[in-house]
A protein has these predicted regions:
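Structural marker of alpha-solenoid helical repeat scaffolds
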Residues: 50, 84, 118-119, 152, ...
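N-terminal leader/linker segments that initiate helical-solenoid repeat arrays
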Residues: 20-79, 83-85, 101, 110, ...
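Helix-start (N-cap) detector for alpha-helical repeat units in TPR-like alpha-solenoids
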Residues: 55-56, 89-90, 123-124, 157-158, ...
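Position-specific recognition of the canonical hydrophobic site in helix A of tetratricopeptide repeat
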Residues: 66, 93, 100, 127, ...
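Structural signature of tandem alpha-helical TPR/SEL1-like repeats
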Residues: 34-43, 69-80, 102-114, 136-148, ...
Length: 337
């Protein structure tokens, strides 16, 4: 059998042609799109009418459509970008994101697989490709992509970080720790890597885990996930007062962060500080009325106070929100006994 290698540019042309064929009639509508109600999108549409050959305008509008989860419209605009500039790297990256969020993972991967052929030395593109390969559980392909990056830039910290992510996803804890440690050695400002390292150390019952959380906070004092990870470590090691103080700190950093309210409420219930717990749960229910756990623990708080009817109503609401919530079902049964 004779194998014919098709140049990347030809593949890209065929893909762009396919995209444009699929949305040609819609694409014409996109150029002459009527008012959408979004002033920024409408302003870009007017600019496109005046400058229909400017790929940057289509790209900006595609980003806005993507932000609004209008995926089909985003794809159509990105097809226009690629027709005007078939090697537009940012358009490739955005198109892959759109496809992935639009539940078209195969198209997302194909889009990113084309980009390295056009930009073989783009580390950013290869990193994004490895991320998508990880999402799709294509571990061997991800390893190969990361190896390609190491050939271009040996010891690249972001590639080492992604290597750790792949190892972690496969349950290879020791290799993951080694990869993340190598990443932070080369770039100590990688807050997320410090958090993950702390979590992995905690899983192995290594008391040094808290040092990694502290490093993450030192690098990025506003990283709520780092503060939360430290608080969770403390509460799991019976350092309740310290954990509660950190949850207060998280409230200051992000008043809309639900986990801090839930965890602090549970700890307060554990401490028999029922009224304080109920205040936390009330805020949580206001932030996220569909949070079944908030209603369940509200029910427990009412139960501890002897308020049976209020407890029953809260447990029932938890079950309405999540009919698989066995703890709420068991709690209701206990109330009836």
């Amino acid at each position: 059998m004779i194998s014919i290698r098709i140049p990347a540019q030809v593949i890209l042309f065929l893909t762009v042609a396919f995209l444009l064929t699929q949305c040609k009639s819609k694409g014409d509508e996109q150029t002459h799109l009527g008012p959408t109600g979004d002033p920024t999108i409408d302003a870009l549409t007017e600019s496109i009418r005046e400058n229909p050959s400017d790929p940057g305008l289509y790209l900006q509008r595609a980003q806005l459509f993507y932000d609004h989860q209008a995926y089909d419209q985003a794809i159509e605009d990105l097809a226009r970008v690629m027709k005007l500039d078939s090697t537009h790297l940012r358009a490739h990256h955005l198109l892959a994101d759109v496809y992935l969020d639009h539940n078209q993972s195969a198209m997302a991967l194909k889009t990113l697989q084309r980009a390295p052929a056009l930009y073989p030395d783009s580390i950013r593109t290869k990193l994004k490709l490895s991320e998508f390969q990880l999402i799709l559980k294509q571990y061997d392909a991800a390893y190969q992509t990361l190896a390609d990056i190491m050939k271009i830039k040996p010891g690249d910290p972001e590639a080492l970080f992604m290597l750790g992510m792949v190892y972690r996803d496969q349950g290879k804890t020791e290799q993951a720790i080694a990869a993340f440690q190598s990443a932070v050695e080369r770039n100590p400002d990688m807050s997320e890597a410090w958090v993950i390292l702390g979590d992995l150390m905690d899983r192995t019952h290594d008391p040094r885990a808290i040092q990694y959380f502290d490093n993450a906070i030192r690098v990025d004092p506003g990283n709520v996930a780092a503060w939360h990870a430290k608080a969770y470590f403390l509460q799991n090691n019976d350092r309740i007062d310290e954990a509660l103080e950190i949850y207060k700190k998280i409230h200051e950093l992000d008043m809309q962060y639900p986990e801090a309210y839930l965890n602090s409420a549970i700890l307060l219930l554990y401490r028999d500080s029922i009224d304080a717990a109920m205040k936390e749960l009330l805020i949580l229910r206001q932030i996220d009325p569909t949070n079944a756990a908030a209603w369940f623990y509200s029910g427990k708080a009412h139960q501890f106070k002897g308020e049976k009817e209020n407890a029953k109503a809260a447990f029932e609401q938890a079950l309405r929100l999540d009919d698989t919530y066995d703890q709420a079902r068991d709690a209701l049964r206990e109330l009836d006994e």
